[in-house]
Every structure is written in structure tokens, then in C-alpha cells.
Amino acid sequence: MGQVLPVFAHCKEAPSTASSTPDSTEGGNDDSDFRELHTAREFSEDEEEETTSQDWGTPRELTFSYIAFDGVVGSGGRRDSVVRRPRPQGRSVSEPRDPPQQSGLGDSLESIPSLSQSPEPGRRGDPDPVPPAERPLEELRLRLDQLGWVVRSAGSGEDSATSSSTPLENEEPDGLEASEAGEETNLELRLAQSLHLQLEVLTPQLSPSSGTPQAHTPSPQRSQDSNSGPDDEPLLNVVEEHWRLLEQEPITAQCLDSTDQSEFMLEPLLLVADLLYWKDTRTSGAVFTGLMASLLCLLHFSIVSVAAHLALLGLCATISLRVYRKVLQAVHRGDGTNPFQAYLDMDLTLTREQTERLSQQIASHVVSTATQLRHFFLVEDLVDSLKLALLFYILTFVGAIFNGLTLVILGVVALFTVPLLYRQHQAQIDQYVGLVTNQLSHIKAKIRAKIPGTGTLAPTASVSGSKAKAE
């Protein structure tokens, strides 16, 4: 047997009477019974008798709410042609036929989504035995196509229902059902659109490890959330944010690692910068005074005697504080704790990572220094070697005038004064520095022009010098 469809809803509402449900003994003598049903299409008497004998059996079976369609008969004619009763034998051929009204009934019945045949194996009204969360992605796309077909069939059914000329007496309830079904289909259309958008969002995802897009079947929880309607946009935003964070996680870890290294390297430099810029006046003043006193002592005494005296001074200060705390404890005015306990509790050990970083830094500095010395003294570049020779020649005159400690003292004074002066007079200093660099570039160009083998470099140097002067 074919598919079973519920029709004739008006038969359930109206009571079964002799006029609506004819007796089996009366046969087809009553012309008023189902007058509209047998005038939809023209069929021959043989087709009508054959259809009636195969499908109906007796006219009393019209009172049932379900009609069984045979697969052979259903494929041969329309659905509404089966429900007609045979015409009475006494009807003349010349009698005019009523206008075809059953077509409007059939179309209105087809317009109801619960009564229309679906091209898919199951009807739309039937509950889905498998939850959408457990379906694969292809089955969800098939469901979207089915919803689109239902919307199109509902729209065609509404057009045919409005175009019918002679409605039945209980066509108004069918129209209400059709309108309700139309609202349901509109809701399902919006649901299908939102589901399509969520599938497009969730399907092309990036792999956190490789960063390439991969096809991904939505998880059950995501599929269940996608069926709740367009109000799940915050969920999509959360999912997108989650995957965005997963994509940035390796980069973030790398940045954190590099940040740790930079902090480990820049922390001493920041302390030195604070001292040189006199951010804390007391600390910078104390450091500057201590350095100048030590250097001045080294001018008159040997380095060994200066180091020994400084060490004794420090020990006298610390021992005096320690004895003072013990005396306070003896007279019951203190707890006798070490005044330097906070410094003693400081962890000065280096972790394995810090040790490796320090060793790598020291090794890199040693290797770079050795490479530079080899470059200068083994004359890898003649110009660079000549520059170094000129620098040492100038230092011979400086050494004849100044002592080494004097140069160190001048350097310390410059370190604690030049940064402040440069901050206050930055524009003027930059202007004078630019003039000096231009003069030096001209001098270098002249020297390179006179040295054999380096004449080709002179035009480029002169061009760069002219550009700098123009600026």
C-alpha cells in the first residue's frame, strides 16, 4: 500500500447523518451526496468503475478519516480522483457539469504541510527519530533542503487556496490551519537560515597546531544549540572568540617567552637608566658620591689598600648594627633579630633557564668580540683596520696628558650629567651632532678616494654626504 494521508477533516467535525453518510444499500441514487467530488476531472465510465472497485469497495468506507492509495493507482491519476463516487445511471449526457471545485480542495489539502507528500522518505510533521545533534553534516544539509521544499510547497498551496472559486462549507477551518502552517513554515525557514549560517561558521575551522582550515563536523552540543533559532548569535561569538584565542595561543606563548627574556635582560638596564636620569635623587646622589670617592681614593692610593679599607668600613657598619640589636635584646627592648634578615632571605639562586640564558649571552659576547678583533687585526677590511689604527694613535696623545683613572672619573661625571643635559637641550644637540657627522663623512670620503682600491666607494660616500647636508 502507498502512503496514508489524513483527509476530509470536515467529516470529523460534522455528525454522521444520512445525507452525509449514505447507506450501502442506496448505492449511487442520491445526487446530492458528494456532488463536488465527482466533477473535478472528466474520466470515462470504465475508469471510474475500475477505480471505485479497486480502492473503495463500498461507499460506507468514505466515513473513515484515512484513505489508502495504491501505488499503481496513485501514480496513474490525481489524488482527488479517487474520492469521487460513481455518477448515477439516470444522469443525462447533455446535463451541464458543475464547475470544477475539487481542484481547489485538493490544492488546499496539498498546501497543508502536514498533508502534503514529501519527496523525502518521511513527512515533515513526523517527529525526527534521530536528534539533529547525532546526524552528520550531510544529513543536516539534507534537512535544510527538505525545509526549503516545504516552504515552496506551502507558498504554492496558499496561492491555489486563494484562487478557488467555490469553497466548501467548512473551508474556513482549513484556511486557519493553512495560515498556522504557513506561520510554522516561515519559522522553519528562519530556523533553516540560521542553521545554515551556523554550519558555515562552525565548519571551516582552523587547526590550532598547523593554522590551516580543516573540515569539522559540529559536536552534538553545538548542533543542539543551533536548533534554538537566531537568538544563538552570542554563542557563535563565543565560539569564534574561543577559536581565535586557540589560534593565537602558540604566538602568545612565544611572546611570553620572549617577554621573559627581554625583562631578564632589560631589568638591570632600567635600573641604570633610573640612576643616570636621577629619577630618585637620593639613590642617584648616593651612588654618584660613592663612585667619585672610590675613584679619588684610587688616585692617591693603591687599588689593594683602597679595596681593603672599603671592606673594613662595610664590615664595621654591619657589625655595629648587629651588636646594637643584641644589646637591645639584652635589656629587653628588642627581639634581637638580624637587621639584615630581609636581605638574607632573598633568593639569589638562578634557575636552569636563567643560567642557560646568561651563559648564552656571555658566550655570544665573547664570540662577537673575538670576531671583531680578528676582523680588525687580521686586516679583513683595510678601511676598518686604518680606522682602528687612527683611534689608537689619538689615544697615545690622550694617555700622555690624562691618567686612566682620570678618564674613568670624567666618564662617570659624563654619565651622570650628559643624559640630563641632552633631555633639556635635545634639539640644539641634535643639530650640532648632524653637522659633525657631515664633516666626518666628507673627511672619510676624501680618505677613501686617496686610498688605492677604494676609489669606487668615494662617489657613493660623496652622494650620501651631499644628501645629509641638504637635509
Swiss-Prot record:
- Name one process (GO BP) from the record: negative regulation of amyloid-beta formation
Pfam families in the record: Reticulon
List UniProt keywords, sorted A-Z: Cell membrane, Cytoplasm, Cytoskeleton, Endoplasmic reticulum, Membrane, Phosphoprotein, Sarcoplasmic reticulum, Transmembrane, Transmembrane helix
State where composition is biased (Basic and acidic residues): 32-43
Give the disruption phenotype, in one or two sentences. Answer: Impaired exercise-induced SLC2A4/GLUT4 translocation to the cell membrane, impaired exercise-induced glucose uptake in skeletal muscle cells and impaired ability to reduce blood glucose levels on contraction/exercise.
Q: By its UniProt entry, which InterPro entries does this protein fall under?
A: Reticulon, RTN1-4
Q: Which residues form a coiled coil?
A: none
Instruction: Identify the GO cellular component terms for this protein.
Output: cell surface; intermediate filament; sarcoplasmic reticulum membrane; T-tubule; terminal cisterna; Z disc
Query: Does Cell division show up as a keyword for this record?
Result: no
Q: Does the keyword Cell membrane apply?
A: yes
Query: Per the record, which residues fall in region Disordered?
Result: 1-137, 153-181, 205-234
Composition bias (Acidic residues) maps to 169-181
Compartments where found: Endoplasmic reticulum membrane; Sarcoplasmic reticulum membrane; Cell membrane; Cell membrane, Sarcolemma
Please tell me in which tissues this protein is expressed. Detected in skeletal and cardiac muscle (at protein level). Expressed predominantly in neural and muscular tissues.
Q: Where are the transmembrane segments?
A: 295-315, 390-410
**Polar residues composition-biased segments:** 100-118, 159-168, 205-229
Q: How is it placed in the membrane, per its record? A: Multi-pass membrane protein
Kindly list the positions at which Phosphoserine occurs in this protein: 44, 226, 228
Assembly and interaction partners: Interacts with SPAST. Interacts with BACE1. Interacts (via first transmembrane domain) with ARL6IP5/GTRAP3-18. Interacts (via N-terminus) with SLC1A1/EAAC1; the interaction promotes cell surface expression of SLC1A1.
PANTHER family the UniProt entry points to:
RETICULON-2, RETICULON-LIKE PROTEIN
Q: What is this protein called?
A: Reticulon-2
Q: What is the lineage of its organism?
A: Eukaryota, Metazoa, Chordata, Craniata, Vertebrata
